[in-house]
Amino acid sequence: MAAGIRNITTTGQIGDGREAAAVDYVLAHAGAGNIDDVLATIDKFAYEKSMLINVGDEKGTLLDAAVRRADPALALELGTYLGYGALRIARAAPEARVYSVELAEANASNARRIWAHAGVDDRVVCVVGTIGDGGRTLDALTEHGFATGTLDFVFLDHDKKAYLPDLQSILDRGWLHPGSIVVADNVRVPGAPKYRAYMRRQQGMSWNTIEHKTHLEYQTLVPDLVLESEYLG
Protein backbone atom coordinates (compact mmCIF):
# COMPACT_ATOMS: atom_id res chain seq x y z
CA MET A 1 0.00 0.00 0.00
CA ALA A 2 2.95 2.34 0.63
CA ALA A 3 3.85 2.09 -3.05
CA GLY A 4 0.24 2.86 -3.88
CA ILE A 5 0.33 6.03 -1.81
CA ARG A 6 3.46 7.11 -3.68
CA ASN A 7 1.64 6.47 -6.95
CA ILE A 8 -1.23 8.70 -5.84
CA THR A 9 0.96 11.79 -5.74
CA THR A 10 2.18 11.27 -9.32
CA THR A 11 -0.57 9.40 -11.18
CA GLY A 12 -3.66 10.01 -9.06
CA GLN A 13 -4.23 6.26 -8.76
CA ILE A 14 -3.04 3.50 -6.43
CA GLY A 15 -1.56 1.62 -9.36
CA ASP A 16 -3.11 -1.85 -9.24
CA GLY A 17 -6.13 -1.26 -11.46
CA ARG A 18 -8.66 -0.97 -8.65
CA GLU A 19 -10.04 2.33 -9.90
CA ALA A 20 -11.01 0.91 -13.31
CA ALA A 21 -12.38 -2.19 -11.58
CA ALA A 22 -14.50 0.01 -9.33
CA VAL A 23 -16.01 1.80 -12.32
CA ASP A 24 -16.85 -1.51 -14.01
CA TYR A 25 -18.39 -2.74 -10.76
CA VAL A 26 -20.56 0.37 -10.45
CA LEU A 27 -21.78 0.17 -14.03
CA ALA A 28 -22.62 -3.51 -13.57
CA HIS A 29 -24.34 -3.31 -10.19
CA ALA A 30 -25.74 0.20 -9.58
CA GLY A 31 -29.03 1.34 -11.02
CA ALA A 32 -28.67 3.90 -13.80
CA GLY A 33 -29.84 7.35 -12.77
CA ASN A 34 -29.88 6.42 -9.08
CA ILE A 35 -27.34 8.58 -7.21
CA ASP A 36 -27.96 6.83 -3.89
CA ASP A 37 -27.35 3.42 -5.43
CA VAL A 38 -24.20 4.56 -7.24
CA LEU A 39 -22.72 5.95 -4.02
CA ALA A 40 -23.69 2.85 -2.05
CA THR A 41 -22.15 0.62 -4.72
CA ILE A 42 -18.85 2.51 -4.60
CA ASP A 43 -18.87 2.12 -0.81
CA LYS A 44 -19.62 -1.59 -1.15
CA PHE A 45 -16.68 -2.03 -3.52
CA ALA A 46 -14.38 -0.19 -1.11
CA TYR A 47 -15.44 -2.32 1.85
CA GLU A 48 -15.62 -5.69 0.13
CA LYS A 49 -13.24 -5.56 -2.86
CA SER A 50 -10.45 -2.96 -2.66
CA MET A 51 -10.10 0.11 -0.48
CA LEU A 52 -10.59 3.39 -2.31
CA ILE A 53 -9.35 6.83 -1.31
CA ASN A 54 -12.53 8.84 -1.83
CA VAL A 55 -14.02 10.55 1.23
CA GLY A 56 -16.18 7.51 2.02
CA ASP A 57 -19.46 7.02 3.79
CA GLU A 58 -18.61 8.13 7.35
CA LYS A 59 -16.91 11.39 6.42
CA GLY A 60 -19.31 11.74 3.52
CA THR A 61 -22.12 12.51 5.95
CA LEU A 62 -20.08 15.47 7.22
CA LEU A 63 -19.59 16.63 3.64
CA ASP A 64 -23.30 16.28 2.93
CA ALA A 65 -24.25 18.38 5.96
CA ALA A 66 -21.77 21.12 5.08
CA VAL A 67 -23.05 21.27 1.50
CA ARG A 68 -26.61 21.63 2.73
CA ARG A 69 -25.56 24.45 5.07
CA ALA A 70 -23.86 26.25 2.19
CA ASP A 71 -26.81 25.65 -0.18
CA PRO A 72 -24.50 26.34 -3.13
CA ALA A 73 -25.31 27.47 -6.62
CA LEU A 74 -21.64 26.92 -7.54
CA ALA A 75 -19.35 24.34 -5.92
CA LEU A 76 -15.73 23.38 -6.53
CA GLU A 77 -13.93 20.16 -5.64
CA LEU A 78 -10.16 19.75 -5.83
CA GLY A 79 -9.28 16.09 -6.33
CA THR A 80 -11.84 14.16 -8.37
CA TYR A 81 -10.49 10.60 -8.09
CA LEU A 82 -13.57 8.45 -8.99
CA GLY A 83 -16.05 11.32 -8.78
CA TYR A 84 -17.49 10.18 -5.45
CA GLY A 85 -17.11 13.48 -3.60
CA ALA A 86 -18.56 15.52 -6.45
CA LEU A 87 -21.45 13.06 -6.63
CA ARG A 88 -22.20 13.56 -2.94
CA ILE A 89 -22.10 17.33 -3.46
CA ALA A 90 -24.46 17.04 -6.43
CA ARG A 91 -26.88 14.93 -4.41
CA ALA A 92 -26.88 17.33 -1.45
CA ALA A 93 -27.27 20.38 -3.71
CA PRO A 94 -29.41 19.28 -6.65
CA GLU A 95 -29.58 22.78 -8.17
CA ALA A 96 -25.83 23.43 -7.99
CA ARG A 97 -23.27 23.44 -10.75
CA VAL A 98 -20.34 21.33 -9.55
CA TYR A 99 -16.82 21.57 -10.97
CA SER A 100 -14.09 19.13 -9.99
CA VAL A 101 -10.39 19.69 -10.73
CA GLU A 102 -8.30 16.56 -11.29
CA LEU A 103 -4.64 16.16 -12.25
CA ALA A 104 -5.02 12.75 -13.96
CA GLU A 105 -6.92 12.26 -17.21
CA ALA A 106 -7.53 8.60 -16.29
CA ASN A 107 -9.37 9.67 -13.14
CA ALA A 108 -11.32 12.29 -15.05
CA SER A 109 -12.45 9.64 -17.55
CA ASN A 110 -13.49 7.26 -14.77
CA ALA A 111 -15.41 9.97 -12.94
CA ARG A 112 -17.26 11.05 -16.07
CA ARG A 113 -18.44 7.48 -16.64
CA ILE A 114 -19.72 7.28 -13.08
CA TRP A 115 -21.44 10.67 -13.27
CA ALA A 116 -23.10 9.71 -16.55
CA HIS A 117 -24.34 6.47 -14.99
CA ALA A 118 -25.70 8.41 -12.01
CA GLY A 119 -27.42 10.88 -14.34
CA VAL A 120 -25.62 14.03 -13.17
CA ASP A 121 -23.20 14.63 -16.03
CA ASP A 122 -25.29 17.59 -17.16
CA ARG A 123 -24.30 19.55 -14.03
CA VAL A 124 -21.03 17.99 -12.82
CA VAL A 125 -17.92 18.84 -14.86
CA CYS A 126 -14.32 17.66 -14.51
CA VAL A 127 -11.55 20.11 -15.39
CA VAL A 128 -8.18 18.40 -15.90
CA GLY A 129 -5.34 20.37 -14.33
CA THR A 130 -4.19 21.72 -10.98
CA ILE A 131 -4.73 25.03 -9.24
CA GLY A 132 -0.96 25.41 -9.00
CA ASP A 133 -0.27 25.16 -12.74
CA GLY A 134 0.48 28.82 -13.25
CA GLY A 135 -3.08 30.01 -13.70
CA ARG A 136 -4.20 27.79 -16.58
CA THR A 137 -6.79 25.88 -14.57
CA LEU A 138 -7.94 28.98 -12.72
CA ASP A 139 -8.44 30.69 -16.08
CA ALA A 140 -10.34 27.65 -17.37
CA LEU A 141 -12.66 27.86 -14.37
CA THR A 142 -13.21 31.55 -15.13
CA GLU A 143 -14.46 30.50 -18.56
CA HIS A 144 -16.99 28.29 -16.76
CA GLY A 145 -18.41 31.27 -14.87
CA PHE A 146 -16.21 31.52 -11.78
CA ALA A 147 -16.03 35.20 -10.88
CA THR A 148 -15.83 37.54 -7.92
CA GLY A 149 -18.07 36.35 -5.09
CA THR A 150 -19.68 33.47 -7.01
CA LEU A 151 -18.15 30.43 -5.29
CA ASP A 152 -20.29 29.09 -2.46
CA PHE A 153 -18.61 25.81 -1.55
CA VAL A 154 -15.15 24.22 -1.87
CA PHE A 155 -14.12 20.64 -1.06
CA LEU A 156 -10.39 20.00 -0.68
CA ASP A 157 -9.48 16.35 -1.20
CA HIS A 158 -6.31 16.36 -3.31
CA ASP A 159 -2.59 16.76 -2.52
CA LYS A 160 -2.57 17.69 1.16
CA LYS A 161 0.48 19.95 0.77
CA ALA A 162 -1.49 21.93 -1.81
CA TYR A 163 -4.49 22.67 0.43
CA LEU A 164 -3.19 26.00 1.73
CA PRO A 165 -1.55 27.39 -1.43
CA ASP A 166 -4.53 26.37 -3.55
CA LEU A 167 -6.97 27.98 -1.13
CA GLN A 168 -4.85 31.12 -1.21
CA SER A 169 -5.00 31.12 -5.01
CA ILE A 170 -8.79 30.91 -4.84
CA LEU A 171 -8.85 33.75 -2.31
CA ASP A 172 -6.59 35.82 -4.55
CA ARG A 173 -9.13 35.46 -7.36
CA GLY A 174 -11.83 36.84 -5.06
CA TRP A 175 -14.23 34.00 -5.81
CA LEU A 176 -15.32 33.39 -2.21
CA HIS A 177 -17.83 35.54 -0.36
CA PRO A 178 -18.76 35.84 3.33
CA GLY A 179 -20.63 32.64 4.11
CA SER A 180 -18.77 30.46 1.61
CA ILE A 181 -17.84 27.11 3.15
CA VAL A 182 -14.61 25.16 2.63
CA VAL A 183 -14.38 21.51 3.72
CA ALA A 184 -10.97 19.81 3.93
CA ASP A 185 -10.60 16.03 4.16
CA ASN A 186 -7.67 14.03 5.59
CA VAL A 187 -6.37 16.89 7.72
CA ARG A 188 -4.95 14.40 10.23
CA VAL A 189 -4.15 11.43 7.94
CA PRO A 190 -2.16 11.79 5.72
CA GLY A 191 -2.28 15.26 7.25
CA ALA A 192 -2.38 18.93 6.25
CA PRO A 193 -0.61 20.61 9.20
CA LYS A 194 0.06 23.95 7.51
CA TYR A 195 -3.57 24.24 6.45
CA ARG A 196 -4.77 23.38 9.95
CA ALA A 197 -2.37 25.88 11.53
CA TYR A 198 -3.58 28.58 9.13
CA MET A 199 -7.21 28.00 10.02
CA ARG A 200 -6.36 28.10 13.72
CA ARG A 201 -4.53 31.43 13.31
CA GLN A 202 -7.42 32.90 11.33
CA GLN A 203 -10.15 31.66 13.67
CA GLY A 204 -12.67 34.44 14.27
CA MET A 205 -10.93 36.79 11.85
CA SER A 206 -11.14 35.51 8.28
CA TRP A 207 -12.53 32.07 9.08
CA ASN A 208 -14.75 30.24 11.54
CA THR A 209 -13.63 26.60 11.62
CA ILE A 210 -15.08 23.45 13.15
CA GLU A 211 -12.81 20.41 13.47
CA HIS A 212 -14.77 17.19 13.04
CA LYS A 213 -13.14 14.15 14.66
CA THR A 214 -13.77 11.11 12.49
CA HIS A 215 -11.95 8.15 10.93
CA LEU A 216 -9.94 7.47 7.82
CA GLU A 217 -12.16 6.25 5.00
CA TYR A 218 -13.61 2.75 5.07
CA GLN A 219 -12.34 1.66 8.50
CA THR A 220 -12.81 2.59 12.16
CA LEU A 221 -9.32 2.27 13.66
CA VAL A 222 -7.35 5.21 12.25
CA PRO A 223 -8.55 8.64 13.42
CA ASP A 224 -8.82 11.53 10.98
CA LEU A 225 -10.00 15.13 10.95
CA VAL A 226 -12.34 16.94 8.59
CA LEU A 227 -12.21 20.73 8.82
CA GLU A 228 -15.29 22.77 7.95
CA SER A 229 -14.51 26.47 7.60
CA GLU A 230 -16.89 29.36 6.95
CA TYR A 231 -15.32 32.35 5.23
CA LEU A 232 -15.93 35.58 7.11
CA GLY A 233 -14.52 37.90 4.49
UniProtKB/Swiss-Prot annotation:
SUPFAM superfamilies: S-adenosyl-L-methionine-dependent methyltransferases
This protein's record includes keyword Repressor: no
Sites where the protein binds a divalent metal cation: 157, 185-186
GO terms of molecular function: metal ion binding; O-methyltransferase activity
CDD domains with a match to the protein in the record: AdoMet_MTases (cd02440)
InterPro entries xrefs: SAM-dependent_MTases_sf, SAM_O-MeTrfase
GO biological process: methylation
Gene3D superfamilies the UniProt entry points to: Vaccinia Virus protein VP39
Transmembrane segments: none
Keywords: Metal-binding, Methyltransferase, S-adenosyl-L-methionine, Transferase
Taxonomic superkingdom: Bacteria
Role noted for this protein: Specifically methylates an O atom of its substrate.
Protein name in UniProt: Probable O-methyltransferase Rv1703c
Organism of this sequence: Mycobacterium tuberculosis (strain ATCC 25618 / H37Rv)
